[in-house]
C-alpha cells in the first residue's frame, strides 16, 4: 500500500513519518519547494522532539519520499490531507483544502481512500466527497471512500500523542470509516471511535471551543482579580479543590493554529448566532491589549515615557516548548506596543530570528515582558538578570514568577495582589 500525505506542516510531516515508520511506502507532498529541499536533507522545518531522528530514519530506509510534483502522487492508494484551513475575517478559508481535493482528483484511482485530517466546519467532508464525485465521475462508497480523522495532538508531544491519544474517525460511508480505522490502527494504541463525518468534524471543534470558552472564563476571573486586589492563581488553586470545579489557567492570550480559529469554524454554517462562543473569543482576543496596559502602567510608575522605553519580550511562540508562532498572543502584544515605545527586542530560544540569548536581549532594557511559558524561563535568576537592565520592570503574562523579584516593579496578569 502506498500513502500520500498532502501538506507537510506541523501535522502532516509527523503523520507521514509515523506511517513510514509503520512500514508503509509514503510520499509526502507540499507546494513549498524550500520545505521539500530541507526535508530531503534530513532536517525538519519545524521544531518537535525526536522529529529529525525519526525523519532521517525513514528517509534512509526509503520508506518516505517527499515531492512538490503532483505526478509523483500517482499510484497512491490512500491520500491524507493535512493542509491549513485559516480564517478570512471570521469566515473559514477552505481554498487550500479544495486545492488539495482537486489535486487528489487528478491522480487517484478506483478504490482510493481519502482522509481529511485538517480541522474543518461541520458538513465540509460531505461537500468534499461530492466535489470529488463531480471531478472524477466516480461515486463515494462505491468507487472511492472519504473519511475525516481530525488530529488531536499538542506541539511538543506530537509523536507520543499520535500513538496514545484516542482517535475519532468519521466516514462519509461506513466502509470509509472502517478502512480508515484499519489504517490508523497500524500505529495508534489509543481507542479509535467510529462515527459519521459530520459528527467527527463537530467533535474536534467542540473540544477546542470548550477549551477556548473556559480559558475566557479564567481570563475574566483574572481581570476581576485586578479590581479586587486578589492573586487569581491562588484563588483558582483553592477553587479547584472543589471536586466539581476545574478552572483553566488565564494568561496573555490564546494562540496556536486551532483554538483562536475553531470556534469560528464551528459557527460558520450555523443558522443563528450563538453569543457565548463569540463573547469568549473577544475576551481572549483582548488579553494582549490588557498586558500592554499593565506595561504602560508600570512605565508610568517608574517615570519612564513609553517613547523612551526599551522593552524585552521573552517568548514569541504561542505556548512553551515549541517554535509555533501561529496566532501567538506574543506577536499581537508586540504589534500593540511597537509604535508606542522606543524599541522592542524579542528573545525566544525556539524561534529563529530573535536575539541570541536572554542576557543580550535584556541588556539596557527598561522592562521585561514574559509572553511565553517556555521551561527555560522558569529557572531564571531575575535579580541577576536585572543587573544589566536600565530599569527593572517585569510584566508576567504567563505566571512564570511566583514571588516578585526584589527591586523590580512587577505586574502580572491576574496578580491583583501586587
Curated annotation (Swiss-Prot):
Subunit arrangement? Answer: Homodimer.
Domain remark from Swiss-Prot or TrEMBL? The protomer folds into three distinct domains: an N-terminal nucleotide binding domain, a central helical domain involved in dimerization and a C-terminal substrate binding domain.
What is the recorded name of this protein?
Answer: UDP-N-acetyl-D-mannosamine dehydrogenase
Report the function annotation for this chain: Catalyzes the four-electron oxidation of UDP-N-acetyl-D-mannosamine (UDP-ManNAc), reducing NAD(+) and releasing UDP-N-acetylmannosaminuronic acid (UDP-ManNAcA).
Q: Which residues form the active site?
A: 204, 258
Species in which this protein is naturally found:
Pyrococcus horikoshii (strain ATCC 700860 / DSM 12428 / JCM 9974 / NBRC 100139 / OT-3)
Task: Report the catalytic activity.
Answer: UDP-N-acetyl-alpha-D-mannosamine + 2 NAD(+) + H2O = UDP-N-acetyl-alpha-D-mannosaminouronate + 2 NADH + 3 H(+)
Residues holding NAD(+): 10-11, 30, 85, 119, 261, 326
